Design a protein with these regions (language model features):
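Short aromatic/hydrophobic "clamp" motif used to bind/position activated sugar donors
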Residues: 252
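Acidic donor-binding segment of Leloir-type glycosyltransferases
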Residues: 183-229
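Conserved donor NDP-sugar-binding/catalytic core segment of glycosyltransferases
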Residues: 260, 264-313, 376, 382
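A recurrent flexible, glycine/aromatic-enriched loop bordering the glycosyltransferase active site
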Residues: 237, 312-344
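Glycine-rich, basic loop-to-helix element that forms the pyrophosphate-binding segment
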Residues: 230-247
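Lectin-like carbohydrate-binding module/patch detector with strong preference for beta-trefoil
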Residues: 464-612
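N-proximal low-complexity "stem/linker" segments adjacent to membrane-targeting elements
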Residues: 13-14, 50-56, 64, 68-184
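N-terminal signal-anchor transmembrane helix specifying type II single-pass membrane topology
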Residues: 1-75
Length: 612
């Protein structure tokens, strides 16, 4: 799936090592269990509790989870400060991290050889392939639909669906469980065919053993399972289009090949599409834990995105809560990546953008395009599917590079004057970015042909929760002439004390200077429900990072006079932000507010048409 619930796992992919110019990528996984602790564990054996439907217009649960998610950046950049565990003989740091992740909640009774096999599979797949191979392909999973869903009846004349599974080097048992689940939990008169798209796997059993299963199934139901095999790896986006081209049913359902369907998943979606073929529908997702394969229930949510175009779960809109009907469709700004759509309408609306690379951003682009060009996007509470969220993605070494390129492509085609926000979020210049986004003329022509609305309409009418940053003048990393190898950094989030740190250009070092003379440090808060951005403030002569709205309401000293290549001076206190030598901190310099000297500051990028 093109998006995982990042609010549930903290996955650190980069450790910044002081004194080095390169980034050493490691894996550090921590499991956030606040939702489970508050609502009870959901086990595979069955549902252990009945949830009450509470009208929560503020969406406190989802906001708490999102706040935890924002700590990921700090973990990513400062994880090297944690004390190291002693390594076992013959074990390196990466092996230890993988072992800790896999065996924290599972496998305590395995012998040494079995642990080695399990760990090797975990490293290869990003989930517990060893355990998957030992689970039934037809295992029972809990029915986590809201209670009212079981009482809804649907017409018998619903359209048929082609289910498309995309995979590359997936565990065979996981693929087969996905297929078995689709067959046994989709009414036979509605399931026309299953299409398996193999994006050039090099795992032999996915050629021989999978084909044997397909042949045996097709002997009983001729041409029921089709296999599309790529001669070269095309990536998730083009693989989904390949699956669509092979489909023949009126409706297509595009899924990853590591899912399990809940009973009654198909009828609610097919009914909505029959009513209006311009609806693109996502089921509600639960989690298959990557280590234990237990099913974890997720709260009902819409699907949105931040300005980097990473998708994220959102609290359902207020209009949904006020209905007090937990079975009602949830209006959603975007899609997670697995979705169901009318086959012909999907072509009319432009399929997926095949000019994108590999993975990431295509789900956000589709949601934006559907809304702007006359369709709608919904999440169905009565349709639930469990999805494995990998501990790590083994099929690409540099996912962020692909997502960044794809995001800039989306921005240029669809976001009009707001495209600058995507460049700001990724900390790349609007001009001469050095990133080739490919030829976008065909997608621009599609937008014109479909007579799509401007992106401002989307922000006003569909994604009003999204924060905008039109006051920004300049952005990037902030360097001081005294030590140009160091950059202003937000430091440990709990301290609210900015620091100088070896420049790496990732989120903790993103700085934004606004027309109201504020200096925002750290990531851009995506929505109004998130914690506010942090602003640089003069607090009793000391530099501090405080929430901008709080500092403004308290009339604190958060306005700074700054010109490119000049000083940074607080308007009220007249003190300048400068570096002073200190033996007590890393890299020998700390920030101070003092009488202005000759120190100069520069920021990386100035927005087009702006003057600093």
């Amino acid at each position: 799936m093109a998006c995982t619930r990042r609010t549930k796992t903290l996955v650190s992919t980069c450790v910044i090592l002081s004194g080095m110019t390169n980034i050493l990528c490691l894996l550090y996984v921590g499991w956030i269990t606040n939702y489970v602790n508050n609502n009870g564990n959901v086990k595979v054996a069955g549902r252990t509790h009945e949830k009450k439907f509470d009208v929560d217009s503020r969406g406190e649960t989802l906001r708490i989870i999102e706040r935890l998610d924002r700590l990921e950046t700090v973990v990513n950049q400062h994880i090297q400060e944690l004390p190291e565990k002693p390594l076992k003989d013959g074990e390196d740091t990466a092996d230890q991290t993988l072992s800790d992740s896999l065996f924290a909640h599972w496998g305590h009774d395995l012998g040494p050889e079995s642990r080695k096999v399990a760990l090797k599979k975990f490293q290869y797949y990003g989930y517990n392939g060893y355990l998957s191979d030992r689970l039934s392909l037809d295992r029972a999973i809990p029915d986590l639909r809201p209670d009212g869903c079981r009482n809804i009846s649907y017409p018998s004349s619903l359209p048929q669906v082609s289910i498309i599974f995309i995979f590359v080097n997936e565990a065979l048992s996981v693929i087969l469980r996905s297929v078995h689940s689709a067959i046994h939990r989709t009414p036979s008169h509605l399931l026309k065919e299953i299409i398996l798209v193999d994006d050039n796997s090099n795992n032999a059993e996915l050629s021989e053993n999978l084909q044997r299963f397909v042949d045996e199934t097709n002997q009983q139901r001729p041409d029921f399972i089709k296999v599309v095999r790529h001669n070269k790896q095309e990536g998730l986006i083009r693989s989904r289009v390949s699956g669509w081209r092979a489909a023949t049913a009126p409706v297509v359902a595009l899924f990853d090949a590591h899912v399990e369907f809940s009973v009654g998943w198909a009828e609610p979606i097919l009914h909505r599409i029959k009513e209006d073929r311009t609806r693109v529908i996502s089921p509600s997702f639960d989690n298959i834990k990557y280590d234990t394969f237990e099913i974890e229930e997720y709260p009902l949510s819409a699907q949105g995105f931040d300005w980097e175009l990473w998708c994220r779960y959102l609290n359902p809109p207020k209009s949904w809560w006020t209905q007090k009907n937990q079975t009602a469709p949830i209006r959603s700004p975007a899609l997670i990546g697995c979705f169901v759509v009318d086959r012909e309408y999907f072509e009319e609306i432009g399929l997926l953008d095949e000019g994108m690379e590999v993975y990431g951003g295509e789900n956000v682009e589709l949601g934006i395009r559907v809304w702007l060009c006359g369709g709608s996007v919904e999440v169905m509470p009565c349709s639930r599917i469990a999805h494995i969220e990998r501990a790590h993605k083994p099929y690409t070494e540099d996912l962020a590079t692909h997502v960044r390129r794809n995001a800039l492509r989306v921005a240029e085609v669809w976001m009009d004057e707001f495209k600058s926000h995507v460049y700001m979020a990724w900390n790349v210049p609007q001009q001469d970015s050095g990133i080739d986004i490919g030829d976008i003329r065909e997608r621009e022509a599609l937008r014109e042909r479909l007579r799509c609305k401007p992106f401002s309409w989307f922000l006003k009418n569909i994604y009003s929760e999204m924060r905008t940053y039109t006051e920004t003048i300049a952005y990037g990393v902030l360097r001081n002439s005294l030590r140009p190898d160091l950059c202003l950094d937000q430091g440990p989030d709990s301290d609210n004390i900015p620091i100088m740190y070896i420049c790496h250009g990732l989120t903790p070092q993103n700085v934004y200077y606004t027309s109201s003379q504020q200096l925002h440090v750290g990531g851009l808060s995506p929505t109004i429900d998130d914690d506010d951005n942090k602003c640089l403030v003069d607090v009793n002569g000391r530099p501090r990072l405080l929430e901008c709205s709080y500092a403004s309401n308290k009339h604190m000293k958060l306005s700074w006079l700054f010109t490119q290549g000049g000083s940074i001076q607080n308007r009220k206190s007249k003190r300048c932000l400068e570096l002073v030598e200190s033996a007590d901190v890393d890299h020998g310099y700390q920030l101070a507010l003092q009488q202005c000297s000759s120190q100069k500051w520069t920021i990386t990028n100035i927005l087009l048409g702006k003057v600093l």
